[in-house]
Amino acid sequence: MNEWLNVAPELLALLIFVSRVIDVSLGTFRTIVIFRGYKALAAFIGFFEIMIWLVAAGQVFKNLDQWYLALAYAGGFSMGNYVGMWIENRFAIGNELVRCLSFNRDVLAEKIREQGFKVISFDGDMGTDKLVELLFIVEKRRNVPALIKLIKELDASAVYSVSDVKSVYEGPEPLPRRLFFR
């Protein structure tokens, strides 16, 4: 390996950079799937992550006199974090809870249900004469942007928040799911 390194050291720097981008991206993605409860997937990803890391780190430690390899290593780490978050965002793994406060009672929940979303609604008041409806909607992350868009279209005055859900129990007979390509 040292023969071609002497001829093209910038190629080794590029390989180290790319290796770090891959292994840190995998690590970022692995960490996120751990928090979402996918233990087996995290273990599978972790195997490849550490194998790539060993190769990249080994080359840097073997050639400590070549400072640009350390720069490639650090640059790959930095870029890998960004790429890992981008990948996780594209996969949109898991569920999210959308809490929505609507001032137009008995309208928003029904219209959202008509679009195939499962909605739990509660009547409430804000301590004044103003009555409100509180909606809870647990939905796949990839469907949440469409749900938020629908809420904004149906009730521009609605207030909502979105939070991650680690696990969901749908009961012995799960309710029918919304089709993804609908």
Swiss-Prot record:
Its main location: membrane. It comes from the Bacteria. This is UPF0316 protein Sde_0566. It is found in: Cell membrane. InterPro entries: DUF2179, DUF5698, UPF0316. The keyword Membrane applies. The chain crosses the membrane at residues 7-27, 41-61, 67-87. Keywords: Cell membrane, Membrane, Transmembrane, Transmembrane helix. NCBIfam families: PRK04164.1-2. PANTHER family: UPF0316 PROTEIN YEBE (PTHR40060:SF1). GO terms for cellular component: plasma membrane. Belongs to the UPF0316 family.
